[in-house]
Amino acid sequence: MGRVEGVTEKPSNWNVPNVLTSLRIIFIPVFAWLALDQRWGAAFGVFVALMLTDKLDGTIARTYNLITDFGKIADPIADKALMITALVVLNVASNLPVWMTIVIVVRELGITMWRMWMLRNDHVVPASKGGKVKTVLQTVGVALYLCPLPSWMDVPSYVVMVLAVVVTVVTGVQYLVDARKVNN
């Protein structure tokens, strides 16, 4: 049978962006093991590679129209799973303050569950510019804690993580304020 004009096929779930997302999930335990074993250079390398796949899968999905329902759900789960794992591992094996992890995890899980609920009700909540800044700050902060750096870098690493926490909270509040405006 031929294609019906005006009808577009949904992309298959078996596509490059979804494979990259799945690989990110599969490699989280490898990252955690390396960090818990204090193989900081290797853990840093795996973390950076996994974060790059996050950027890459999104770019490929948008460029080639390979956005799928699986990707909409699995990608944010993979992102949060990696970041939460990294934060918890740094609490256990390094000197990242626990309060930072608690604040970030509560916000990430809360907003992610809310976005999933909105998606389930056919409302896509796109990532905000502030959310992208938050992700960059969290990524850089975690990378600084993972990277074997001289002790004089402890203060700059801490400052980046404090900024990440502040932006995490502010963007979380902003999502809720924006949602309230939409619902009113």
Model regions and ranges:
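Alpha-helical transmembrane bundles and membrane-interface segments of multipass inner-membrane proteins
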Residues: 1-184
